[in-house]
Amino acid sequence: SQEKHHTSAFDINYFKGNIALHNPSILHLITGHPEGFIFSYNIKTFGYNEWERQYNYPDYGVSFAYQNLKNDVLGNNYSLYGHYNFYFLKRNLMFRIGQGLALNTNPYDKESNYRNNAFGSKILSATYIMLNYKKEHLFGHFGVQTGFSLLHYSNGNVKAPNTSINSLTLNLGVTYNLDEKEPKYILLDSSDIHKAYKEPIKYNLVLRSGINESDVVGSGQYPFYVVSAYVDKRINRKSALQLGTDVFFSNFLKEYIYYRSVSFPEEPTTGEEDYKRVGLFVGHELFVNKMSLVTQLGYYVYYPFDFEGKTYIRIGLKRYFGKKWFGALTLKSHAAKAEAVEFGVGVRL
């Protein structure tokens, strides 16, 4: 019979904790200790692909979570994620990161639920991270894991209000491995480590779009467009450095400039200011198989209207389709204030 290259495992975790007071405006929403469960399916790797050896044999999989936020105004969240598990300290310590979407049962409504300033929409972006001690096969197929879990929900300013919610929790879980016996790990050999990995400088062009709204509730959702051009240099198997420029066409800002000029006549805003912005950025890309994690730090060099400061951050995921084309899902923010969730399509030449 053919030797298996992967095995599967389930885990189910109960969690309970606190909502972090990251903004005084959500104080009225913190009334109890939120709790819930996370159910996950994991595919375990054993080094049959090179990226698995480079990252110390991670798992990848899907998770479903239910969270009771212990406040009728906030409602409950049901979420679905894709996740990776990374292992440290002889595989006793697991770090998991999951990204997906959540459904909120009681979002903001100006008449029936005006106190929910955390969630302006039913669909939210959801992220969770877990740092757990994990011991599999303690009793046959069963094992345990326990530690900290952080759950974050936000709609990325697709619709106001969007104060978002972060929960800091403790979790306790049971693991179940479908296979009694696991394949042997293919070890990282010296040729993997010392083999130089070189690529010439690559040129990237990305078109990004989406909808968003300013923090003024009811001001309306507008489409935005971003053109990004940058060069990247792969410095090793895992990383590339980026340098480039973004041009932002944000229609919500055009509306917001007009709103400031009319509603605050004492301010210097005339309403004629250009809503376009141009930024320069440096970035890093971390490659994990066909996916990559992108982090960028930018500075506006063309900034006619003062909106949330001159520096911006972009963080998100890319998925490559073949050698040249990729899709991207990114969050652009000014420090901790989200501006937009961007859907992008790009080419790397």
Predicted regions and their residues:
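Solvent-exposed loop/turn segments connecting transmembrane beta-strands
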Residues: 30-33, 68-77, 215-222, 235-237, ...
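Outer-membrane beta-barrel "beta-signal"
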Residues: 166-187, 338-349
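Repeated loop/turn-to-beta-strand initiation elements of outer-membrane beta-barrel proteins
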Residues: 48-50, 91-93, 137-144, 180-183, ...
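Transmembrane beta-strands of outer-membrane beta-barrel proteins
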Residues: 8-12, 58-60, 93-97, 142-146, ...
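Outer-membrane beta-barrel translocator/channel fold
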Residues: 8-28, 48-54, 74, 89-142, ...
